[in-house]
Amino acid sequence: MAAVNGVGISWPSKLTQGQRPKLVFSPSPRRCTPSSSTIKMTASVDEKKKTFTLQKSEEAFSKAKELMPGGVNSPVRAFKSVGGQPIIIDSVKGSRMRDIDGNEYIDYVGSWGPAIIGHADDEVLAALAETMKKGTSFGAPCLLENTLAEMVISAVPSIEMVRFVNSGTEACMGVLRLARAFTGRPKIIKFEGCYHGHADPFLVKAGSGVATLGLPDSPGGPKAATSDTLTAPYNDISAVESLFEEHKGEVAAIILEPVVGNAGFIQPNLDFLAAIRKITKENDALLIFDEVMTGFRLAYGGAQEYFGITPDLTTLGKIIGGGLPVGAYGGRRDIMEMVAPAGPMYQAGTLSGNPLAMTAGIHTLKRLQGPGTYEYLDKITGELTQGILDAGKKTGHAMCGGYIRGMFGFLFAEGPVNNFSDAKKSDTEKFGRFYRGMLEEGVYFAPSQFEAGFTSLAHTSEDIQKTVAAAEKVLKQI
């Protein structure tokens, strides 16, 4: 355990087999599993197993492949890295999801992060129903934008002004253009395995689906769009210093995931973020935290509150839309005032700030303000992660992993894992077998070893116990 300056809490270092972090949570915290976000559903994980079948999913996916490239609208959903039949989802509620074959799963994907208070929360749905009565999109300002903007600005240390967009990719595209406009410099530094969306400059040595499919980069990205993207291994300060030395006066910004969630779950070494902050200041470059995953998940103020490091600019997404399409970028006022129409840096969007996304975001953030929220996430995620690692040790598998609050990950590798190169040494074939086995046991993890997992306020200790028991059963079988 190592204290984080300015936060007043402890955070677990990378877990390996046999290491058990002290879970730091308030005595008798409020149970953060609201009755409004849970329902009683007959679950395959809660009752004697019926025969597991994906026949309807198989039929639907076969048809989908004739209609959409690969049968999906985002590559990782196709199960390429884990094998087997992709599941077609019919409904979600609380911590559970049900496919069209009637199988139910404890869900640790959470729509890739947004569902931090649980799926289809009753309070959020009720608020959306009221908002929809007034219309779904105005293409003009609405008061809800002010409300959510005030909430984001008050929560995130770096943000003095914010611009809402429609996705995390869009947020990263906008913030990159802004950094170049503000500094007058062309180059950016990103880290190997970090994923900042599918825009051309960010797909150089990217994580997420690019890593899942084993692609070095993506075809179609012209050299003109990628030649100013410099890369370094995550957690490697000397590599960053060398890039600044080689490209003096040319680097506009460093952009990074403060905790990597798209190349496995990789935590920053204790001095890494502080050193990056120091280097950018010394070189008059901007520091950008991509908090699309970590924002409002590691703490109400995101990773920057958790670690006590304040960047110049921040991107957000996922949670701030409560499950609806959304993104945002924000930061220092003097930088943000360059964004049109206040300044010359142009960026626009038809559906940006639409009332539905604003409503869902407002009511999700309100729920996160409740007492004991992040202590509860820390508790259940710690139990889950350590339980899986203990099961791996008990059954003779080399595994490593870690967690922070409501975000976690594990790899079939000895560890430690400090960067993408370390993560790629993991046993992806074994993970595929583990993954398929867990599906049959009614547990849904991300269908790639290189994607972080997420817990929610709707997950219960019973969910965790069932998951750990299922993991031990499957690990024995493989």
Curated annotation (Swiss-Prot):
Q: Which coarse location class describes where this protein primarily resides?
A: plastid
List cofactor names only: pyridoxal 5'-phosphate
Would you say which domain of life the source belongs to? Eukaryota
State the GO CC annotations.
chloroplast
Q: Report whether Kinase shows up as a keyword of the record.
A: no
| Pathway entry | Porphyrin-containing compound metabolism; protoporphyrin-IX biosynthesis; 5-aminolevulinate from L-glutamyl-tRNA(Glu): step 2/2; Porphyrin-containing compound metabolism; chlorophyll biosynthesis
Keywords of this protein's UniProt record, alphabetized? Chlorophyll biosynthesis, Chloroplast, Isomerase, Plastid, Porphyrin biosynthesis, Pyridoxal phosphate, Transit peptide
* GO MF, any single term: glutamate-1-semialdehyde 2,1-aminomutase activity
Q: Where would you find this protein in the cell? A: Plastid, Chloroplast
Q: Does the keyword Isomerase apply?
A: yes
What EC number(s) is this enzyme filed under?
5.4.3.8
Q: Which reaction does it catalyse?
A: (S)-4-amino-5-oxopentanoate = 5-aminolevulinate
Positions carrying N6-(pyridoxal phosphate)lysine: K318
Going by the record, the broad EC class of this enzyme is isomerase
Tell me, what is an example of a GO biological process annotation in this record?
Answer: protoporphyrinogen IX biosynthetic process
Question: Partners and quaternary state?
Answer: Homodimer.
Which NCBIfam families does this chain map to? hemL (TIGR00713), PRK00062.1 (NF000818)
Sequence similarity = Belongs to the class-III pyridoxal-phosphate-dependent aminotransferase family. HemL subfamily.
What's this protein's name? Glutamate-1-semialdehyde 2,1-aminomutase, chloroplastic
User: Which organism's genome codes for this protein?
Assistant: Nicotiana tabacum
Name of the gene = GSA
